[in-house]
Amino acid sequence: MESAEIRRRWLSFFEERGHTVVPSASLIADDPTLLLVPAGMVPFKPYFLGEVKPPFDRATSVQKCVRTPDIEEVGKTTRHGTFFQMCGNFSFGDYFKEGAITYAWELLTSAQDKGGYGLDPERLWITVYQDDDEAERIWHDVVGVPSERIQRLGKKDNYWSMGVPGPCGPCSEINYDRGPEFGVEGGPAVNDERYVEIWNLVFMQYERGEGIGKEEFEILGELPSKNIDTGLGLERLAMILQGVQNMYEIDTSMAVINKATELTGVAYGDAQASDVSLRVVTDHMRTSVMLIGDGVTPGNEGRGYVLRRIMRRAIRNMRLLGATGPVVKDLIDVVIGMMGQQYPELVTDRERIEKVALAEENAFLKTLKAGTNILDTAVSDTKASGGTVLAGDKAFLLHDTWGFPIDLTLEMAAEQGLSVDEDGFRRLMKEQRERAKADAQAKKTGHAGAGAYREIADKAGATDFVGYTDTESESTIVGILVDGASSPAATEGDEVEIVLDRTPFYAEGGGQIGDTGRIRVDTGAVIEVRDCQKPVPGVYVHKGVVQVGEVTVGAKAQASIDDRRRKAIARAHSATHLTHQALRDALGPTAAQAGSENQPGRFRFDFGSPSAVPTAVMTDVEQKINEVLARDLDVRADVMGIDEAKKQGAIAEFGEKYGERVRVVTIGDFSKELCGGTHVHNTAQLGLVKLLGESSIGSGVRRIEALVGVDAYSFLAREHTVVAQLQELIKGRPEELPEKVSAMLGKLKDAEKEIEKFRAEKVLQAAGGLADSAKDVRGVALVTGQVPDGTTADDLRKLVLDVRGRIQGGRAAVVALFTTVNGKPLTVIATNEAARERGLKAGDLVRTAAKTLGGGGGGKPDVAQGGGQNAAAIGDAVDAVERLVADTAK
């Protein structure tokens, strides 16, 4: 049974039993604690935690998953992989143990012609938690599994929790006996190589308390709502149903291995070392395609680093196999060919996926040879000196200059019997980051070093900031910098940095951007100020352009800020304080500020949270903020000692350093924070605050984007206009729109199903005529042809199998049909048993056809699929298939 059919049967089985089919979520987890989705239940986590009420009682999905903790083992064993698909069924307060167990048994053991997987019940073994009498009773008394095939295991194996206080419960695993050739008997408690786990049923019925690890924690009691979370590894079940030894030999993986062997000339099974490389390439290319398809791009941090690491590992292993040129495009084509039916977005997004992958391949190939030479020299030098540890600076050089991920260096060094000084590498990386941070600040402020500013400060003293009370000031120019160097003067058109003895300009800090405005010199010169920074303590630097005249040190000037812009920024900054306090009231003190940025009419606020904030909580926070605005609370700023400020409960701003005297901004009885920024005088001046939403920006950190004042009103006005337009189109009140739109979408879905049914029937109507057109080639009934453009891969496969079934009389039959999808050729070829007995295998025929089409393909001996780039070559591909049939048929 093909992987696509396993997936289809899973979803169909549970949909027929009242489950809502939920499409696979993106691999980019909507959870700050996770880099990538590692399990099928992750998209449902908010429902299990009670953060969001689920819109259904039952759900089922086939979720894309990526796990990378054992990436170094991928290829070395046949059990490790980074990408897999997790089939799951979920119940939220609906059915519980008996429902989950009976559903699982029915699907696994029902005959294949009845929609099941047709597994032999005698080969299924069950494990339950050691104290779960109820689960064992259901398995034995209700399902009928003999007691000798039910084993009890402890918390380590058969109890599930998230590792923190929250839902937990016992689980029951279904294991398949692969036979005596895989080891001794005795069940999964004795041999997990022979008895392979295929399905895990988790019974979430208890609340976990504090504790350590997977075993040492307290059970606080039963949950008010008992839930079901199950997971079945699709690739593992495919391994069993397809009768192969491991997951690398199933249809979706073997096609990639076949392409890699075609590109390198190294056959799978020739040698242990080459088999390892072929498995690495197969797994990592599948993972790469799925990650890029979900929007991940190669980089040096987070998900981007995971992708870069596995891509470069795959490329290097192709080189070890003998590839000399670019290979990823060919491999991507095969992956999409095998996975595109289940995930059609891969086909739609093929061009972007290939573009991202090719860019990474080209970048790595440019440096791989040189980097490998550097590493080989370093390894030789280390061994020659009797050392066993590669120096950290060598690993840093490979990373910094040649783009080698540290993991690749570790792996390549280990192949030569060396370890790597990782501490030294990390120290050098830290020093580089600190230099980069300093360089970025220098670029931002436009200075080449702090010396010039300190020199000005030594001569003229610190800048007197009067911007809390004044928008203008009479000032003296005490310093001018042009191109980062001190200058006595600057002329019209020069980009300059001006230092004044006194200024109303706020310098960027505390999340508030710098002021803009003008400096008018008594001589008539005018400087447009575009930013204000404070590169060294006490010195305010006004960055801008001399618009008119000449500016000299010592000249008198009038400095004035853009007051309208300043007020808009002040509204945003005060709104940030209100948002911070409202979040702390809603979520507790853990919702501490982790950064902010205040701009005219809008702000963003970063805060700590282990998970997404529920929509209902966000609505309450927004309402509370606007209620404070309506209370007309005064905003006051006081300077006091740091100890007094702490005594009053003032909250410190993220990332700021404070002296003995601090400025405390108080908003009525609602908020009190240490802050050096500018603010409104009364909350009514904010007018309106609209929170646009929150999202994850890193592990444990969320970000809120918001609008203030006129910007918030304009946003709501636009939304109101859209709602009014929808009312006109749908003929309903605003509160009726969700229900009406949902009903319309339901009708649309039904119509699409009817169209799909009609289209499939039209395609199959052609089957009879095609079967009648069979051509005799050395006693083989050969059917070839091109069907209408745009026929889907699924429909083409159905048509091919239908035509094959119409050729009767025990004749050997080969059916090879072609079409084009989005201008690119696609072929499906099938053979019957009589043809296979004469040496005709669909996979061989497809590879021949696909090669003629400028692409690749693969599959099983009875049916295979391929594609290419050159649709004009379909006629040549038909001829190539006919020649191969004539040459091969015994």
From Swiss-Prot:
Gene Ontology CC terms, in alphabetical order: cytosol
InterPro entries listed in its UniProt record: aa-tRNA-synth_II/BPL/LPL, Ala-tRNA-lgiase_IIc, Ala-tRNA-ligase_IIc_anticod-bd, Ala-tRNA-synth_IIc_core, Ala-tRNA-synth_IIc_N, Ala-tRNA_ligase, Ala_tRNA_ligase_euk/bac, DHHA1_dom
GO biological process: alanyl-tRNA aminoacylation
Subcellular location: Cytoplasm
Alphabetized GO MF terms: alanine-tRNA ligase activity; aminoacyl-tRNA deacylase activity; ATP binding; tRNA binding; zinc ion binding
Catalytic reaction list: tRNA(Ala) + L-alanine + ATP = L-alanyl-tRNA(Ala) + AMP + diphosphate
Cofactor(s) in the UniProt record: Zn(2+)
Chief place where the protein resides: cytoplasm
UniProt domain comment: Consists of three domains; the N-terminal catalytic domain, the editing domain and the C-terminal C-Ala domain. The editing domain removes incorrectly charged amino acids, while the C-Ala domain, along with tRNA(Ala), serves as a bridge to cooperatively bring together the editing and aminoacylation centers thus stimulating deacylation of misacylated tRNAs.
Cited PANTHER family: ALANINE--TRNA LIGASE, CYTOPLASMIC, ALANYL-TRNA SYNTHETASE
Listed name of the protein: Alanine--tRNA ligase
Organism the protein comes from: Streptomyces coelicolor (strain ATCC BAA-471 / A3(2) / M145)
Gene this chain is encoded by: alaS
